[in-house]
Amino acid sequence: ANITVNMNIVANPSCKIDVILDEETGDVIKGEGNGRLNIRVGTREALSIRGQYEISKGEYTFNFQTFFKRPFTLKSGTITWNGDPYLAIIDMDAEYLAKNVDMSNLSSGSSLRLKDDIIILSHLSGSLKKPLVTFEFELPERSPLRKDYIVTKRLADFQNDENTMNKQVASLLLFNTFISDEQNFFSQQNTIGLATNTIGSILSGWLTNTFNRELEKATNGVVSFK
């Protein structure tokens, strides 16, 4: 027999979800979302999903080998399906506020002795399973360094070199400092893996798990996306 199930699902925006990523380190993401989806599946028909799921907000604390804890804030974003569930497209932003960062490696001038906060902005795009991750640095609105030409120029220069940007992001996450051109704490491969996979894999994994839980609840476990 050929059985086909066609469902229209409205995800409840008031639903709050906790996703345990690692029981040993205590990595948990808390999030909220909503959306309207059409899901079709049959005994002779592959799973098809169409529609958009919106992430309204979320929180995540990244534990690096249980020694470092770094709080991330998930901004609003979307996951869009046009049929094949594995080809979902994401568009999402996250940020991490690094506090009291040593700025000495950014400038040889008066800013050498300054410490200040800096925001790491991360944008995720492309495939849900393998997102593209780009970074950007932003100084808080009240930061005195916003008027420092050398510091702002250095931060802007990082944008033009993906490897350098990833290296600086990794250094901020682990050591709360920028590193100079002469320092080489990370190999290129490890740096890219730490900076992009830390955020990209975690967030894409969370998005997948979050949606899958909503889907299983809506269909009483009949349909899941894995």
Where are these regions (language model features)?
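Interface/linker segment at the passenger-translocator junction
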Residues: 1-226
